[in-house]
């Protein structure tokens, strides 16, 4: 026994320290136990981090979608204001349908009214165009912007919103005038709009404009929306779940029409306000002069 391992008792006897009872193998076991406990602690910490990540990441994703939705609303407010300023300058007449000449359409007419800021036409969810397409006119999708070609190389437009075609002050395309049975639905200026807070001017869409009709069903493909030329721009151009907590890239390509439509879009109305509208609610707006709000047709 080493001298420093012993102590004197009260009666002068020698007391042995506790270390005398621990042989080398016992010490190794004790050290191993301490190491094992440390590993268990580390595994518990890792598990807790995983649980916290599972709770926090969806919240962060939701917050990001919400931020994009707010920016979209701000964009549409600026577009709506630009449209109102144009009408004020042209004695209450809405934007003309201009695809001849330089093909400015509404984008070229309004550019000066929103400070020539091109990005105001782009919803943050859909800013990129389809670069794989070689067409001069490229359709958008739930998460991509459309592209409109002009004869002026400096005036190629892109955007994520459509203009309500029933508001155009003159409707003549390369094939001629709008058919008479449809022309009766046109708003003939500011004085003919009886429900300004429920009459859309702009909305999230896969194309530059639209002419919804009461009998229009939603698009079966909620990612690409409904296509169609001329004045045949159905409401399906707008039935894309771009907002409302929905991830636009995951929009169904083949939707069961018996189910409620998912998601929502932003709508700018004639009175200047912008609202988030569920897709199923789109038939409750006054898209044209003779519209009767009702349930969604299938």
Question: Where on the chain are the PLM-derived regions?
Answer:
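N-terminal leader/signal peptides at the extreme start of proteins
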Residues: 1-39
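Intrinsic disorder/low-complexity segments
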Residues: 7, 34, 54, 143-146, ...
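Generic cytosolic/nucleocytoplasmic N-terminal low-complexity/intrinsically disordered segments
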Residues: 20-22, 26, 63, 163, ...
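Short helix-capping and inter-helix turn/linker motifs at the boundaries of alpha-helical repeat units
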Residues: 30, 58, 98-101
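Amphipathic alpha-helical segments typified by the pilin-like N-terminal helix
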Residues: 34-74
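Short, well-structured segments within or immediately adjacent to enzyme catalytic domains
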Residues: 70-298
């Amino acid at each position: 026994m080493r001298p420093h391992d012993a102590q004197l008792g009260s009666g002068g006897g020698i007391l042995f320290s506790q270390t005398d009872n621990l042989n080398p193998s016992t010490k190794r076991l004790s050290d191993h136990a301490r190491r094992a406990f440390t590993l268990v602690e580390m595994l518990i910490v890792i598990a807790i981090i995983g649980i916290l990540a599972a709770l926090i990441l969806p919240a962060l994703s939701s917050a990001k979608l919400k931020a994009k939705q707010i920016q979209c609303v701000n964009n549409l407010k600026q577009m709506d204001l630009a449209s109102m300023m144009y009408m004020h300058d042209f004695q209450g007449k809405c934007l003309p349908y201009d695809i001849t000449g330089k093909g400015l359409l509404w984008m070229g007419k309004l550019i000066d009214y929103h400070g020539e800021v091109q990005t105001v036409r782009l919803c943050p969810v859909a800013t990129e165009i389809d670069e794989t397409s070689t067409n001069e006119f490229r359709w958008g999708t739930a998460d991509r912007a459309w592209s409109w070609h002009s004869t002026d190389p400096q005036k190629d437009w892109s955007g994520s919103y459509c203009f309500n075609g029933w508001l155009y002050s003159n409707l003549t395309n390369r094939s001629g005038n709008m058919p008479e049975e449809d022309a009766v639905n046109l708003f003939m200026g500011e004085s003919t709009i009886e429900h300004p807070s429920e009459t859309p001017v702009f909305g999230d869409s896969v194309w530059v404009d639209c002419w919804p009709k009461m009998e229009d069903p939603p698009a079966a493909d909620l990612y690409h929306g409904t296509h169609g030329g001329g004045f045949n721009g159905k409401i399906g151009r707008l039935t894309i779940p771009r907002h409302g907590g929905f991830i636009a890239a995951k929009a169904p390509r083949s939707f069961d029409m018996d189910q409620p439509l998912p998601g929502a879009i932003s709508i700018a109305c004639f009175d200047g306000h912008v609202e988030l509208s569920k897709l199923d609610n789109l038939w409750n707006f006054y898209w044209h002069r003779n519209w009767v709000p009702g349930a969604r047709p299938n």
